[in-house]
Curated annotation (Swiss-Prot):
NADPH binds at T10, G11, S12, I13, K37, N124, E126, G205. It is an enzyme of class 1 (oxidoreductase). This is 1-deoxy-D-xylulose 5-phosphate reductoisomerase. It holds the Pfam family DXP_redisom_C. GO terms for biological process: isopentenyl diphosphate biosynthetic process, methylerythritol 4-phosphate pathway involved in terpenoid biosynthetic process. SUPFAM superfamilies: 1-deoxy-D-xylulose-5-phosphate reductoisomerase, C-terminal domain, Glyceraldehyde-3-phosphate dehydrogenase-like, C-terminal domain, NAD(P)-binding Rossmann-fold domains. Pathway: Isoprenoid biosynthesis; isopentenyl diphosphate biosynthesis via DXP pathway; isopentenyl diphosphate from 1-deoxy-D-xylulose 5-phosphate: step 1/6. The gene is dxr. It comes from Clostridium botulinum (strain Okra / Type B1). NCBIfam families: Dxr (TIGR00243), PRK12464.1 (NF009114).
Length: 385
């Protein structure tokens, strides 16, 4: 029996993680959850799974859930804020922490979980992007597994199993291309949030949907892959694959290319991470090769989708530059969703902040938190948020 904590239990990945646990109750037990303010969903989770702990970040939501548990004589202990997140990430009985919160908020709980010897099922891209070197070194120090919970890195992880790192030539990360695949810059001037939120293949949260539309999501995955698999940026390639059947590939020096293929369904990488190193009975629709008419691959347009190009630049620059990129992107996406900037301005703001805030400093926890704060305060004042 594996005991699980889910950080971000009410979001897209968190909800699908609950689906996996629901179908594997003999092997997986939900011990603790966190959420921002979706108290109704938290109450439903408490009713069904009866976790020992629930954490709410927002004060009012915390009080509502706490009152519900008291009134209904439910034993779930309700905690709040970052202290609560860290507490449930370091519980002695927990084996694996699923980090599916969005943004920088997942960084400190993830590091604390690693220091407590927990395996990490990592769905929070930002953690590795801003502090990859620190996270990976901590994981090695404490002998814990960092298990990627996304289709691309989960695929690469599987393609590498049983092979030697020195035999790898290239990692090939596939991208659906998002809702604007094939469009040029001039065609994206009038894009509104509702257009960018319509992903052709995946059901995702709002922030990651916008990242997918700008190809920033793929840029973050390139930086993640660098840290997760120890591969240089020049050997990490992005290929647009609109069918989303091939989830990523590894090219070896003898010319062999190993690809992981499956129906596009996030429950597969979630299930694989939670049960690692074992495989369990499938919870997704099997891949039917007779129904696949063709598989196509294209080169990404980095001029139109500037954030992908900037992610490579930030990764190669290293230090705190990925943290600057990430902080600027989180704010820029929020500004776009609120109608305060245009779609193409997202890339412009990333470039502006990378130029303005770069400092030659090591990516320590203190440094990345500090530069992230600087970027957010600057954009906050600029756009009065």
């Amino acid at each position: 029996m594996k005991n699980i904590t889910i950080l971000g239990a009410t979001g897209s990945i968190g909800t699908q993680t609950l689906d996996v646990i629901r179908k594997e109750k003999e092997e997986l037990k939900l011990v603790a959850i966190s959420a921002n303010k979706s108290y109704k969903k938290v109450i439903e989770i408490i009713k069904e799974f009866k976790p020992k702990y629930a954490v709410l970040m927002e004060e009012n939501a915390f009080k509502i859930v706490e009152d519900f548990c008291i009134d209904n004589k439910i034993d779930t202990k309700v905690l709040k804020g970052m202290e609560g997140m860290i507490y449930i990430s370091t519980l002695e009985e927990v084996n694996t922490v699923v980090t599916s919160v969005v943004g920088m908020i997942g960084l400190v709980p993830t590091i604390k979980a690693i220091e407590s010897g927990k395996d990490i099922a990592l769905a929070n891209k930002e953690t590795l992007v801003v502090a990859g070197e620190l996270v990976i070194s901590k994981a090695k120090e404490h002998n814990v597994n960092i298990l990627p919970v996304d289709s691309e890195h989960g695929a690469i992880f599987q393609c590498l199993r049983g092979n030697k790192k020195e035999e790898v030539k290239n990692i090939i990360v596939t991208a659906s291309g998002g809702p604007f695949r094939g469009k040029k810059k001039e065609e994206l001037i009038e894009v509104k949030p509702e257009h960018a939120l319509k992903h052709p293949k995946w059901n995702m949260g709002r922030k990651i949907s916008i990242d997918s539309a700008t190809l920033m999501n793929k840029g973050l995955e390139v930086i993640e892959a660098h840290f997760l698999f120890g591969v240089d940026y020049e050997n990490i390639k992005v290929v647009v694959h609109p069918q989303s059947i091939v989830h990523s590939m590894v090219e070896y020096k003898d010319g062999s290319v190993i690809a992981q293929m499956a129906t596009p369904d996030m429950k597969l990488p979630i299930q694989y991470a939670l049960n690692y190193p074992n495989r369990k009975e499938s919870q997704i629709e099997p891949l039917d090769f007779y129904k696949i008419s063709n598989l196509t691959f294209e080169k990404p347009d980095m001029d139109t989708f500037l954030p992908l190009k900037l992610a490579y630049e930030a990764g190669e620059k290293g230090g705190v530059m990925p943290a600057i990129l990430n902080g600027a992107n989180e704010v820029a996406v929020d500004l776009f969703l609120k109608g305060k900037i245009e779609f193409l301005q997202i890339g412009d703001l990333l470039q502006e902040c990378m130029n303005k805030f770069y400092k030659s400093m090591e990516a320590t926890l203190e440094n990345v938190i500090s530069v992230d704060k600087e970027v957010r305060e600057y954009l906050g004042k600029k756009y009065d948020i």
